[in-house]
């Protein structure tokens, strides 16, 4: 475990990044760069050490390599997602798009393909932390921020969801995606719009739009009664996705 120490800055106020990679050179480069721009950094060289450090340090974001000894990144991601919605960005040298999508399906929020620019990774970290830490979404429909469906309660102010009175855990990115769809319920968002609004990707980045499809699939699996025949998050053919129109009967008045 490696930590940066800076006497002039209270470490408790700094956002903490856990870097997990079996390549010492990558760990060192990222630790140095992220420390210089104000993050508190901890590092792990394999999956088992990563899980131990995760529970000890409670990081604000995890940078996670896929190919590692003892326990690979997929396994680490699965274990973290059992009890945490911390943002996870996966590092992958795997060229197959299917491999990257696997990470997203297991709960990762984003991915960066090796070799990558450290500046790009820094931008991705800022983006996921900004979305995680941003002020609660304010619905134009209700001051309570609570929307009720037959089996689902969405509390936008507390960023909590209950399905049949049972709390459903969403990652920060999943909730941001849901917020976006709800913000214009009944109106479709294109995949490109979603990539730009939620992930901060501009059209010239040429990002695989299946990133959106994977996250929509995960949301449906968690929220819908029948994910294969969704009632809430609908597909707009040839366009993208929309949340079903929210009416006054769905809104809890204050």
From Swiss-Prot:
Signal peptide: none annotated. PANTHER family: OMPR SUBFAMILY, REGULATOR OF RPOS. Probable promoter-specific protein mediating the interaction between DNA and RNA polymerase. Residues 85-103, 144-245 bind DNA. GO terms for biological process: regulation of DNA-templated transcription. This is Probable transcriptional regulator ycf27. The modification 4-aspartylphosphate is found at residue 65. GO terms for molecular function: phosphorelay response regulator activity; transcription cis-regulatory region binding. It comes from the Eukaryota. NCBIfam families: ResRegRpaBCyano. InterPro entries: CheY-like_superfamily, OmpR/PhoB-type_DNA-bd, Sig_transdc_resp-reg_receiver, WalR-like, WH-like_DNA-bd_sf. Residues 16-129 form the Response regulatory domain. It is found in: Plastid, Chloroplast. The gene is ycf27. Keywords: Chloroplast, DNA-binding, Phosphoprotein, Plastid, Transcription, Transcription regulation, Two-component regulatory system. GO terms for cellular component: chloroplast; cytosol; protein-DNA complex. Pfam families: Response_reg, Trans_reg_C.
């Amino acid at each position: 475990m490696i930590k940066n120490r800076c006497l002039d800055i209270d470490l408790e106020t700094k956002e903490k990044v856990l870097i997990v990679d079996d390549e010492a050179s990558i760990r060192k480069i990222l630790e140095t760069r992220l420390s210089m721009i104000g993050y508190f950094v901890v590092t792990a060289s394999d999956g088992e050490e990563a899980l131990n450090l995760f529970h000890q340090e409670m990081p604000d974001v995890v940078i996670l390599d896929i190919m590692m000894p003892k326990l690979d990144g997929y396994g680490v991601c699965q274990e973290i997602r059992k009890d945490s919605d911390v943002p996870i960005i996966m590092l992958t040298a795997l060229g197959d798009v299917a491999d990257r999508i696997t990470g997203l399906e297991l709960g990762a929020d984003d991915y960066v393909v090796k070799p990558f620019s450290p500046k790009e990774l820094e931008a991705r970290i800022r983006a996921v932390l900004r979305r995680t830490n941003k002020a609660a979404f304010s619905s134009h429909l209700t001051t309570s921020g609570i929307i009720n469906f037959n089996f689902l309660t969405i509390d936008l102010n507390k960023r909590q969801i209950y399905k049949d009175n049972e709390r459903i855990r969403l990652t920060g990115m999943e909730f941001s995606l849901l917020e976006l769809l709800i913000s214009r319920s009944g109106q479709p968002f294109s995949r490109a719009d979603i990539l730009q609004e939620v992930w901060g990707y501009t059209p010239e980045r040429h990002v695989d739009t299946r990133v959106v499809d994977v996250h929509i699939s995960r949301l449906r699996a968690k929220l819908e009664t029948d994910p294969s025949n969704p009632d809430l998050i609908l597909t707009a053919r040839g366009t993208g996705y929309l949340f079903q129109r929210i009416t006054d009967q769905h809104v809890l008045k204050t």
